[in-house]
Amino acid sequence: MIKKLVLFVSLTGVFLCTASCGHKELPSMGDYSVQVFNETHVRFAPDVYPAAFNAPGPDSIYHLVNGRIILKKVTLPEYKRNVSVKLRVTVASNGDRWDKSGSCFVLPNASGINLLNIAKGEKEFPAVDSVKLEKMIGIIPGTDYQPTVELMRFMTPFGVGHYSSPEDSLTKHRKPVYVDHWEDSVSWEQDITDLYPLLEGGAYVGIFIDTWTLEGYVASMTIDVDESDLTCDALPKKHVEPLMNTVYYIGQEYPDIFARKDVSLDFDIPQGARDVRLKYIVTGHGGHSGGDEFVEKQNIVSVDGVPVLDFVPWRTDCASFRRFNPATGVW
């Protein structure tokens, strides 16, 4: 099977438009760092979080879909100068032994329908063409709806942190002698400067981990903004247009449609747009038997029928550690 995303230039697009500030001196807001989450539980806990929407406590964190999503609003300074933005996510197992797919995301402010008001029961994903998309609601734009934008995708290493002790009963006999120790957590850093427009004016950001255990994980997230030191380095005018997101955050189908057909949508690039870029994130994991997790799959993205991305999301340096995982060893 080949996974294909076919984009036809006719409706919305992902474009970044830049503009110069001339010699005008711009005020400095300074560098900024905000810790959004600090070892916050992400877990399947219906007894603790009994509904799709659970009101936040003093920490202002929403727990959606029985705790498998954490969500919080962040507000950054209103910058006039150019900035670079980095996202850092740290995850440790709180008892879940498995490798789980995770998604760090932002809800587009321009979308009247989003995960938060869907969880509240106030909105629903727009209906889709069942011939083209089967039952895959929420993966492409619709009336008053833009898909959730993924800032980072990750995989949780088997039981990282919770089962890392040298004396842990599940791992002490499985660690190879040539590995000094297992890590207490795993961290990822991603440059999200291109997606900064989605954070301007305040936005809801969150983490989803596909865990089905009560223990789950603890997750931390930090956003760092580095402001330009140049007084005339103006913040470029940029626009981000969400096109597709197949993560099944809430009430959505498992994204196996690519096993049966290509998925296509139309988008427009406005006249005069410059520095147009298409961003595509994929992990070769999280699928059923026969999917990317188990078999090498070609991923193709085409625009107006011309392939612009063609690759296989596959690594060959992980298998040697598989037998040491605290869940099952080799299976």
Model-derived segments and their meaning:
Residues M1-S28:
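Bacterial Sec-dependent N-terminal signal peptides
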Residues C21-W331:
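Extracellular/secretory-pathway and virion-surface proteins
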